[in-house]
Amino acid sequence: MSLINWDDFSDDHVTEKKPAAATSKAVKNTETVPATSTAPVIATVEPADQQQDQNLGSKAEHEEHEEHEANTGLEALEMGAARVTVDAKQMINCRADLNQLVPFKYKWAWQKYLDACANHWMPNEINMAADVALWKDPNGLTDDERTIFKRSLGFFSTADSLVANNLVLAVYRHITNPECRQYLLRQAFEEALHTHAYQYIVESLGLDEGEIFNMYRETPVVANKSAWVLRHTKNLADPDFKTGTTEADQQLLSNLIAFYAVTEGIFFYVGFVQMLSFGRRNKLTGAAEQIQYILRDESMHLNFGIDMINQIKLENPHLWTTEFQEKMQALILEGVELEIQYARDTMPRGVLGLNANMFEDYLKYIANRRLAQLGLTEQFDGITNPFPWMSEIIDLKKEKNFFETRVTEYKTGGALNWD
């Protein structure tokens, strides 16, 4: 399948709707709640309150910094240049040599890369025979179940291509730290692997490839989400876009929040719950097992992205203004509204023990998690997780796959945590 082009969508595809909750609570100032990781993100920088005192009023220093362009790793060789030190490294706008992986500054990024490599899997390892038999049985699944399954595949199959495009064509270019770039390369491979998995499921079940892979063009609620992703990420792929000014750096930070907190952290979760619900009922267990592994990968992508965003905030506190925080809060809530619309469209009736109201509660629960991880105020009071079994599926500290279709051993999977 060819990669998707940013020109395929215009802003008109996105339904603009600002949820009332976006302004219902005050935004926190600079509190940071890092994603759970093997090493705290703040371990490499000074505490946020000290960073504020030293940097928020340092306009002259920031203007001096803006005079220099960041390295890309493609600069001409400079013989006899000084060796890279840890202190010279930074997440964005770094002028140190990006081709030198060590010494590490962000050890958490390197550990996530190692964990991802240890959790490697391939779609064709998973037996789809039972899925094929069930799908071919005219009485095996209801029409609603078949629609939900195909709708989820339709969004997933192109969304991971959009994610890969943004990683390769935009994010990698502007993150100026080699250990983080190392993880981004692994993430890009995993996005390709996920697209491979969707193709493997489609081919195994004999589904109409055109129907599945064109759903992002032909089904409005899928198109709305894809268009939203493109609208919030395409600017960074412009060859003329450069970081180094407050406006440009905030554009990058906004892209990362839209990319990780919303696209990776919200837009996939209705589909994840729906697909995994089949496996819980011993239906389509081969496909559900692959979705479980994809969910595991995506949870690591999300945690890495949150840690990277928080690191940028700590190193560049002048970017994290009250006005910018309000914009990011509204951006996340806009994504939640789109995903709620998607849930209601895909589940007009209760199926698999699920219904649209449960998904609305779940998405608000997820949104509170994302807001808190970024140091923003939670917007939905009294919300609990209506799908506690999702935590069991995501928990990697086990020797057997959740659906018991094959034995798996995760060497370092226990280092990961859903939160």
Q: Which positions does each model-derived feature cover?
A:
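Non-heme di-metal
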Residues: 136, 143-419
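Intrinsic structural disorder/low-complexity segments
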Residues: 53, 65-68, 304
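N-terminal intrinsically disordered, low-complexity tails
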Residues: 6-63
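Membrane-interacting alpha-helical segments
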Residues: 61-81, 145-147
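Amphipathic alpha-helical packing elements
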Residues: 71-135
